[in-house]
Amino acid sequence: MGKKSNITHQCLKELNKQKKFGESKFEAKQAARKAGRNSATVRGIYSTVTFNSYVRVCKQFIAETITNHKNVKTFADCKKYVPEFLQDKEDKGLSAWTLAQYGSALASAYDCQKNDFGYDYPVRHRANIKRCRGVNSSDYRSPEERWDTAKMVLKATGCRRTEALRLRKEDFREATNGNLEVFKRGKGGIERWCLVNPKYTGELREYLKTAETHPVSGENRLFLKAQLPQSSIHDMRADYARDLYQYFEDRGDVATGKIYHCKGDMLGRSFDKGILSAVSYNLQHSRDNVVVNHYLWK
């Protein structure tokens, strides 16, 4: 076995130790809080998407380190070159979010925290996000008619791509107040019933009456990969978030009167914390600032 293959094997062996597929990261963090521990210390890789992403980062790191430092013999030898690798990626223009992901990937492989490498990660600013920026409405994205049904379901449910691909007819139910609810199977093992965007309740009901299903992994699912727009669907989740905020604001029974005041380039804007929490819950998030900075910023 060559040096590169040997070091890669050592790395993958460490990454495999972090696998916690089928477990819930959300529940693990809750358990940590109840035990009086910092939830940020919860370790493990809870999804195959994250695992595969981390593998790609680690393989890239190993390949570049071996090329630049012929003296390394083991994966442990490579660790001191992590700051150099990350700095090189920063110099080449990788975003602060991507650099943080790279750090998390390598931290998982080395069973440490990403800040333990001694690299000074750049600060993440909302204004620097490029995904879906310059798009005023998801109606202008993937305008082809063939995406109309998928876009309607995405804006109705607020699903991430992986969540949408796992939707079944039985994942929808009538709520007591006349709305619809959707069962989302999301990141980190979070599974919950969420509100369907009331703007699309009638249209979604009609769709579900005749919707075709496809056998995937022993389930009858509503969408195949090819039936969802290939471009980012984040802006459709943003549409969902903004519609839900307006819905809860109009309803009047969710607002708490406690105000979230925006900072930075959103200085002067404010949102009710009770409504933010409700929107965050239905997006399968857990932090109000994420909802504001990534979904309600327009």
Question: Which positions does each model-derived feature cover?
Answer:
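N-terminal DNA-binding module of tyrosine recombinases/phage integrases
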Residues: 1-44
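Conserved tyrosine-mediated DNA breakage-rejoining catalytic core shared by Y-recombinases
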Residues: 166-203
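Short functional hotspots where side chains directly engage DNA or cofactors
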Residues: 179-184, 258-298
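N-terminal core-binding DNA-recognition domain of tyrosine recombinases/integrases
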Residues: 26-124
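Active-site/catalytic core of tyrosine-dependent DNA strand-transfer enzymes
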Residues: 197-251
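DNA breakage-rejoining catalytic core of tyrosine-based enzymes
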Residues: 117-144, 188-199, 219
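A short, glycine-centered helix-capping/turn motif at helix boundaries
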Residues: 153-166, 243, 247-252, 283-286
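Basic, Lys/Arg- and aromatic-enriched nucleic-acid-binding interface segment
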Residues: 132-161, 270-276
